Amino acid sequence: SHPLWFPNTLAPSWLNGEYYGDRGFDPAGLAADPDTFERMRIAEVYHGRLAMLAVVGALVPDYLGKGIWYEAAQNAGIGLKEVAIFTAAYGVFEVARGVKENSDPTTIYPGFDPLNLTTDYTKEAEIKNGRLALTALLGFEVQRHVVGGSPLANLAEHLQQPLQRNIADSIMHQWPVAMFASSGHKDGLWFPNAEPPALLTGEYPADRGFDPLNLAADPDVYARMRVAEVFHGRLAMLCTVGCIVPELLGKGAWFEAGDSVDGLKLGFITMAIAAPTEYWRGQGGFNWQKGELDRSYPGFDPLNLTTDYTRAAEVKNGRLALTAVAGLTAQYLATGESPLANLSAHLANPIGANITTNLAMFASSGAKEERELWFPNIVPPRYLTGEAYGDKGFDPAGLAADPVTFERMQVAEVFHCRLSMLALVGCLVPELLGNGAWFQIWDKVDFNRFAVVALQVVAPLEYWRGNGGFLWNDEETVDQSYPGFDPLNLTTEYTKEAEIKNGRLAMNGMFGLEVQSHVTGKSPINNLID
């Protein structure tokens, strides 16, 4: 009955709207324990108050011309003396707070309120403003590292050039895979180190050298395709808004619209609008054979707002929207639910509800509705009963016949899977960011120093494991690979199965990368482009 953080979501049973600011958001189940929930609520109020003060302290001096917030420490000359004063000031309060036992936690409201101004409304407002302030501080920090300017300076630039100076410009302009970015900058190819066809010179907006089928070789065809892309992109952007916004407003899912609309009437109205335009286009309205090929830009622009930047941005946003519409359709056919319903299900259970949940043996899905075997119609060994996670009956060498050996192998597989998943990310992400191929890393790293550091990290863990850390020969549990490190208690039967499957994929992936480097001498991304 209380407002929720996202439409159509289901709040956990322990979040019933009793407390201020409760919107039913707890995907990790952190508030299930009442004592922990109590501490977290108090901590949120404290951090929210500090954040609100910090936001004011960051913006007001900048507004008054006293400098940027992150320069304050450099200019204030803060040293050991100042730190000691700060510690003495807040240390007394922290000690007093820590020694009070069985104190009433509601004393966080109002805190200091000699005039008795606190009401239910102000308590709720304080939580909301505190959350905004916490988000704002995170934004200030990110903004500082991305653009290197103050919040007010960035705001002034944005107000002067809202289309060119925005978050998309800052993020997408730096990302090497820029084809589908919403920014209008004309830099980068569709994939790092790709070789564009000679006919794609970068002359036209959002040309990223992508034409594997050589469709743009004919100039007339290329002109038609460019105009068609703009048209379809515009329709897709309108379509995406038309799918998402009504559902946000509680008007139902996009695929239910036909149930409440007269199809014949809609068809006649659509034809009455589209037919004259299509007739004009079919009768040479774009003068494709007369050299006037670019009437898609600006299209309708009575205020003359179109620039090279907006043209490129329109194409990129259109491509995003075309992809989104295809995704909405595929999502509906696969799940039968609306995009927001799928999103809320994913956010509530990101591991159990995602694109991979319906795939097969080596998929990341952890579902075990019925046992699947590694090959159709085979007979698994009698000792592989499907009880263990990821057991698909594959053991041609009979290695798992001994229960103790099988136990060791299970734990070892989990370890190697986790390492492989980390390794695969470490191989691909740096190359996507333009930092070179994975096998070139030793050109930049001192191997001896790296080995010493790695040994210092790994050796204690291996010593503990080798000296009975997993109690393989004792009567106690041998399954400390699950959950391993799981302070938030997120591990479930599903995640254990999914981890094994993803790990097997990753081990195959790493083996493939190694073979690929020896056979072709190129990185995985370059091989993919080729």
Swiss-Prot record:
Keywords: Chloroplast, Photosynthesis, Photosystem I, Plastid
GO terms, biological process: photosynthesis, light harvesting
Record bears the keyword Cytoplasm: no
InterPro entries recorded: Chloro_AB-bd_pln, Chloroa_b-bind
A matching Pfam family: Chloroa_b-bind
Main subcellular localisation: plastid
Any one cellular-component term (Gene Ontology): photosystem I
Keyword hit for Chloroplast: yes
Cell compartments where the protein resides: Plastid, Chloroplast
PANTHER family associated with the record: CHLOROPHYLL A/B BINDING PROTEIN
Note: The LH38 protein is synthesized as a 100 kDa polyprotein and is entirely imported into the chloroplast where it is subsequently cleaved into 5 mature 20 kDa LH38 proteins.
Protein name: Light-harvesting complex I LH38 proteins
Native source organism of the sequence: Euglena gracilis
Lineage, opening ranks: Eukaryota, Discoba, Euglenozoa, Euglenida, Spirocuta
